[in-house]
Amino acid sequence: MITISSLSKIYRTKNRTVQALDNVNLEIGTGMFGLLGPNGAGKTTLMRILAGIVNPSQGEVIINGHSLKTGAGKKAIKATLGYLPQELGMYQELSASQFIDYMAILKGIDDTQKRVQQVEKVLNMVGLSQDAERKIKGFSGGMKRRVGIAQALVNDPELLIVDEPTAGLDPEERIRFRNLLVNLSDERTIILSTHIVEDIAQTCQDMAVLSSGQVIFRGSPAGLMREADGHVWSFTSDSMERPDHGLTVVSMLHLPEGIQYRLVGSSIEKYPTAEAVKPGLEDGYVWLMRSKGQTVDVL
């Protein structure tokens, strides 16, 4: 169990002060937990605090009974933590197995036999056994992400934190990566931080939305979808003029009879032929951001 209480983080420079997190309160249990929000919402700051890399300005984090406020607590948490940041620096001239072995040494796995077994185990888990001796510099972006997950798993963590893991991946690698995370979540807590709504929809049963450093939604993906009930429509137009009148265009589909728009907004009076449709997670997210006064530019 992770308990985050009244957590705030302020960055101060000579020219300005930035409140990255503002009184965040969350409880996170076992399984996949999704943290969704736009770029700049404070997600990475929160992940770095949980990983013990950044100290909060205020508040407390307790993970499995250990507080990040104390040196002993931070040490205990790091021993059971795996972390994949947005940008993981890798030694490109090393092979995958050499890099994971190096990371295992840094994580305190001193027993050579145990380390060899763990390296083989995690490379197999992420589907890289056949490429274990290849140099990382020859890997695709998706393969490098899987190396990143492997190094995060090498100490068999109870808590795995992954920050924007699918950004920049092609559709096939994104699906592969999501499936990998779901398979790993049976035995541990995984926090998936992302701005990609589909990643949450396909992996998580519990989630929160962060915006401007504050939690603006906490619940299930189904609960977020319900937020948009009565505010999502489908409208087909033979005109190239894009629907407006305070509506957000979530998607456009070109059909023989015209362009089919999926719209989110408070009123559809200007388009009497529009039909109400069942919200998806992206619709719920767009409606939530609109209702909180946040700018949403989907298309």
Identify the residue ranges that each predicted region occupies.
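Conserved ABC ATPase "signature" region
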Residues: 101, 105, 113-131
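Walker A (P-loop) phosphate-binding loop of ABC-type ATPase nucleotide-binding domains
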Residues: 38-42
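Catalytic Walker B motif of ABC-type/P-loop ATPase nucleotide-binding domains
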Residues: 160-164
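Helix-to-loop junction immediately C-terminal to a conserved catalytic motif
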Residues: 51
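ABC transporter nucleotide-binding domain
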Residues: 176-263
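A short, flexible loop at the N-terminus of ABC-type nucleotide-binding domains that lies
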Residues: 1-4, 10-23, 71-73
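Conserved ABC transporter NBD signature motif
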Residues: 59-70, 76-77
